[in-house]
């Protein structure tokens, strides 16, 4: 396939396994799509599923609340299917609906990371795509995984905050042009933690 034909030694194969959200598959997706995605992620270096997609990829029933230990087990399990780095987005923080987290596992270093940030009650299509793009750019420029997580999480939060104040059709996604310049600025290396 395409990845096998074009992969180079310095390539980074990043897959955002778009399947669903909020515990449900997207309406135009079915079981066959899940099976194909399970096959595709075997070729990835990095995957960025949200919580819903994680459970579909693992063939487990969706569970909104999970402990750090459960999430670490899920990260490790899905990593065994191929990707060396697994990043789970949109992880609710137990007991605090005003926060959300991103969890990550780096199989090579056998380390787990978590970044927690404020949750804003706004939904914009494309935030997962933007998050994955920032992670990709950060890793390609040589940032460590925790720095890439910080950069992407902060950028998405800034984008949502910048967009939230405008009378704007949410279906248009976040107003990237309002925050794009922030990618050139130093990040606050303070929000990630090793778990």
Predicted regions and their residues:
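Glycine-rich beta-alpha junction loops
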Residues: 19-21, 53, 90-94, 118-121, ...
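Conserved phosphate/ATP/ADP-binding segment of small-molecule kinases
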Residues: 27-112
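Charged C-terminal helix
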Residues: 146-195
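Glycine/small-residue-rich loop that forms an oxyanion/phosphate-binding "nest" at active or ligand-binding sites
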Residues: 1-39
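Short pre-catalytic strand/loop immediately N-terminal to key active-site residues, enriched for Gly-Thr
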Residues: 111-125
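Short, charged, surface-exposed loops that flank catalytic or proteolytic processing sites
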Residues: 61-71, 140-151
